[in-house]
């Protein structure tokens, strides 16, 4: 059923209204690495005079709250891009082994040499004390490194509890075995992240459930001790050659999911459990919200997938209400298409879809890859599956020939050749868990693995290749290829963002200013050189990653 359901109500947050008056020059679409330099600069050193590499130096604009982070090199030097003149806060993001450093009300106007930043260590020991202010800076990987337990016990957590929230959200709590049993039962039997509908069968069997509960009660029980933290290495070399900008969004608890860019340089984002979608103007930090018209009574609102087509029409999926909507920013009108799916409302319908060059939606569900009319919801073409019931993610190659998707919760991928009708369903290693992904310029399908594995289906060899992540206990939700064939993805729970070169099979990990990296979908601006990478963290801020090479 198709329904025209009126205009979205555009709302501008108070901070965004103020930010919109900033007189920023309109940046050209193309950029070079030199354009990411030329701003305030300085040196970071320790109290004993040692030059420090890999320190995250951050300036926060008072008017817009935009956070810009750069990294000190091997000589302790850092350099910001050109910034709008104004008042800023200078701070060190995630100082970890060092005491916090903050300098308020700093006037910035041009490429000034800033006073040296001198940091004092919290401890000279290799391990960091379990202080609350240090715990708040540590990644999920570092939390797991500090806790006792077998590889089997930790693996139960990392392959079953890693895609809806941070590990910190779990480990900040303390319960006895009965309390953890109630939580694990709710989390593993709830349908999707809302946990409204309950399934009689959990995500794993009773024996494994008991093992996980016992381990949690041991390491995070009422009387368990807090061991010191093992800190992952700071960035070095090419890892420091990046500028990361963060844009705070105007609401709490948005559960933000996807981003996509339009032709005007705006970034659209989808809150997973909210009635609003939003548009960020990166030049000013202004955020405009649009209210998606109400869903039926008793149904959770929220937009899962978001995509901007070549005409700047915005598309989104309502995973709990089981609809697709189309939004025209010029008229601010939504049009909703209700999908007939077997799942009950408030349970996920499989909301990660793909739009092909001709405007059709693709997905794999119900033992078939399907081409669907975007404005009707009618199935136009089907390619039956023999092994998997469907895919978690959906992608269409740039020429429109291939469909691809990760088969999570099964271990494998689906790739369909829509010209020949061939369908490939290769398996991958146990618990690799490919979910979302995209095609590279050569037509290879890449997928982010829930079990910490980057997966490629080589379209020429018709084979699957696996590349394990370099950081322990890291997970992935998605992976995206740029114009050069390099692969980008957030390392969930590791506080890192990966860049993988398939030619050399080498990773670069950019360390993030916040200890999360919960990235559900990446949008890459291929018009810049180097490319510019965007994602929205699940906890409510949009991130721009600009490598210098």
Residue ranges and their predicted role:
Residues 37, 41-52:
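Structural motif
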Residues 52, 79-87, 95:
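Short Pro-Gly-centered beta-turn/loop motif in secreted/extracellular proteins
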Residues 62-77:
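Short, acidic Ser/Thr/Gly-rich low-complexity loop/linker segments typical of extracellular
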Residues 64-65, 87, 91-107:
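A short, solvent-exposed loop/turn motif at the edges and junctions
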Residues 157-168, 212:
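The canonical Cys-X-X-Cys-His
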Residues 252-263, 296-310, 342-358, 387-400, ...:
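Beta-rich, blade/repeat-based domains predominating
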Residues 267-273, 314-320, 356, 361-366, ...:
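Conserved beta-strand positions in repeat-built beta-propeller and related beta-rich domains
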Residues 512-549:
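Blade-level signature of beta-propeller repeat domains, shared across WD40, Kelch, NHL, RCC1
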